[in-house]
């Protein structure tokens, strides 16, 4: 049937998003200028923030870059903020953009090594409880130094690969479409496949939570960590040590949850790898090992050496994080023989959409600063006692981060805390403690939903999720024990351990206060 030009434009607008979603975004774009000019810029600013959080929460309906970007462009156009203020925010956070562009791309060229490691873990550890713990620990360690998205991408690659191998064997190679189970006519084979799906689901969730447990600990673990570290004037070691009073107890209890849910088969965990599947995968791995050439073996060794360089460069703060990532790209591609421009370009595909979205975040942050939107909330929190301030910052961050994106939330709150310090409302010592509360608040409770953790959202929207029947609801349910324990232990750490442990670390000479002058933090 022929459609009118108007219908064609509406169909093209935001692509395959639901009609109600398209109407909501159009409604926002119509209402915002009216409220800004005829009601109140402050109210319009808050409407923009809520609308932007809505686009983040609806990320499965439409990637937030397009609707959020339209709202941000309009905000600049009508005068909610200026292009100069947006450019200033981007300049202040250039390190974060470099982290996303170069570090994620750099790790892309180390995927062979990471795939090798996770494959060996899966096939060589027979105890499901120990295997789950190993996946959680490996993801945590890698996420402390690499980007969580990349770590999850690698685990997804391993899982999809294994699923494909077994699915093709069990369906007698009759159909290469791994989404189609019609070739599996044996009831026993169906049950084995369902058990394998449950096994992969639990492993993916353990790995996903592992990225959060490790990612909160270091300044490169999550993008917002780098923003917080820069604002507070911390280097890699400072950040790690300052977070320990909260992150270490959370890490220990997170691993305990991993063991308990597997041992007692709670919340959908506990499924074993079927023996039939193990045999198929082991045979395949043996064939792959036999075919591996000397060239490929040397690539793995080179990538391992580059991995050591990456850890040392970050730990010793030898260069800015993005530049370390760039060095990884150059070293890995040079010594692994990747010199084709097209092959290089693939490495940047994963990170650039999120980098563009983060730039839109900064435009919304510019509106928040220009319109002083969070000033009343911050004033309310800062009226409380210093210890209560820490808990309130942690809880406010946690609540918002579980429904919105934690990079956005962390950026907004650290800017407000920094502003309070610069205006003499809080001391330097209190600002440093608030920075810890903000970082842990944005990272820990955000495992509650896929909206909060970019790695979880990446998993949910991946090709693997439908194969292993991992839906939004199931992901929230399986994350629940982790959410409750990590949030509560984190809060107790902020409330009871953070202040005394920080004082002890300062007296012991492990940490010292940075010099902050002219809005710039200079670490010792």
Swiss-Prot record:
The chain crosses the membrane at residues 13-33, 98-118, 140-160, 239-259, 304-324, 325-345, 358-378, 448-468, 479-499. It is found in: Cell inner membrane. The keyword Cell inner membrane applies. Keywords: Antiport, Cell inner membrane, Cell membrane, Ion transport, Membrane, Sodium, Sodium transport, Transmembrane, Transmembrane helix, Transport. Pfam families: NhaB. The keyword Lipid metabolism does not apply. Belongs to the NhaB Na(+)/H(+) (TC 2.A.34) antiporter family. Na(+)/H(+) antiporter that extrudes sodium in exchange for external protons. This is Na(+)/H(+) antiporter NhaB. It comes from Yersinia pestis.
